[in-house]
């Protein structure tokens, strides 16, 4: 048997040299070269304000159903972050996923809170609501992020789909920690004149504008920003949502929560789900590379984002999306899960 192994190694070495001489990729037994061996899952930390816009819950449902994602933990931000963590925990427990879900910071760094409550918490079971702690240590969420990133250097993608209060605190408290990240992906900002109801503003960016500014100033890793000007193109009517979300038990849970949302809205936009899907399938969007500046000059414009093209910049902003491919990618995750 050792002789056979030596012969195989000699054969591989010879074919490798011949392949290189011919300008081809050499044969290999490495995992990445064997089409039957799947690439490792993408390690993910999720920071979310689940409990307000329904798309956070939709994104989390997609993430836990996506076979190519290894969700390491969840942190929550803005008002009633304990209730937001409880909502996230309802989804993870429904699929048997036992991971840390930790409430983080609530108050913006400078301005007054604009997102005080988690409206969808009304859908929490009464037994859960009665046992929620009244107080929490928000720094525990930051501790968890720091420890997880340091334990997985270069492997973790940080997905931020709420106001960036926790992310700014992470970068402030652990200088250089972003160098250990694979990348940061955000749903936030608006980077073009594409028409939306709020002009140049976007909610995640303006709720804590100083945190938004710190994110773009302090991060030392690649950032992919999926802005409102892109996500606004992806939407469904309540009737379409009710029809499509009947197909999977987890989507049925989210559908029940969405009824709170649809009392005040006539569409579901897939803001956060697009950011999540772009982690697995980056080519759902096309991008432009550069830098992002955040306006802090006055209260009316605070949080408005401006993109400047720069080939040396760390930021890639989405500039276009394929809606059909997105919805196919999104619902495929649930149909595959239903068959397994």
Residues covered by each model-derived region:
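Short, mixed-charge aromatic SLiMs
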Residues: 81-87, 110, 190-194, 293-309
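N-terminal export leaders
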Residues: 8-24
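Metal-dependent C-N hydrolase catalytic cores
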Residues: 40-44, 83-151, 313-322, 326-335
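Short, well-ordered secondary-structure micro-motifs
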Residues: 112-115, 196-197, 235-238
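Active-site histidine-anchored catalytic micro-motif
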Residues: 39-50, 54-86, 90, 131-231
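N-terminal secretory signal peptides
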Residues: 1-7
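Conformational coupling and interaction surfaces
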Residues: 40-41, 62-65, 70, 203-210, ...
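C-terminal segment of N-terminal export signals and the immediately downstream linker at the start
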Residues: 26-43
């Amino acid at each position: 048997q050792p002789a056979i192994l030596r012969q195989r190694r000699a054969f591989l070495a010879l074919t490798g040299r011949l392949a290189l001489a011919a300008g081809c990729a050499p044969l290999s037994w490495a995992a990445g070269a064997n089409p039957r061996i799947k690439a490792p899952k993408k390690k993910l930390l999720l920071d979310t304000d689940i409990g307000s816009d329904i798309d956070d819950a939709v994104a989390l449902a997609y993430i836990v159903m996506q076979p190519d994602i290894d969700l390491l933990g969840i942190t929550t931000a803005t008002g009633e972050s304990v209730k937001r963590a409880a909502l996230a925990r309802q989804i993870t427990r429904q699929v048997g996923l036992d991971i840390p879900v930790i409430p983080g910071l609530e108050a913006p760094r400078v301005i007054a809170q604009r997102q005080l409550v988690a409206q969808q918490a009304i859908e929490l079971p009464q037994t859960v609501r009665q046992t929620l702690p009244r107080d929490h240590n928000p720094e525990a969420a930051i501790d968890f992020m720091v420890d997880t990133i340091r334990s997985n250097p270069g492997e973790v993608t940080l997905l931020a789909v709420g106001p960036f209060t926790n992310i700014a605190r992470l970068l402030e408290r652990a200088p250089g920690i972003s160098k250990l990240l694979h990348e940061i992906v955000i749903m936030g900002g608006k980077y073009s004149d594409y028409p939306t109801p709020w002009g140049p503003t976007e909610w995640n960016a303006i709720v804590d504008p100083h945190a938004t500014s710190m994110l773009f100033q302090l991060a030392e890793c690649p950032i992919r920003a999926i802005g409102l000007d892109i996500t606004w193109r992806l939407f469904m009517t309540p009737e379409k949502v009710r029809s499509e979300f009947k197909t999977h038990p987890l989507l049925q849970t989210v559908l029940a929560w969405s009824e709170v949302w649809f009392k005040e809205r006539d569409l579901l936009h897939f803001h956060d789900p697009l950011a999540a899907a772009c982690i697995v399938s980056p080519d759902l969007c096309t991008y432009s590379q550069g830098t992002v500046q955040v306006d802090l000059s006055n209260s009316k414009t605070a949080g408005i984002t401006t993109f400047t093209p720069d080939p040396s910049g760390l930021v890639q902003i989405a500039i276009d999306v394929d809606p059909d491919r997105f919805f196919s990618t999104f619902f495929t995750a649930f149909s595959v899960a239903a068959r397994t």
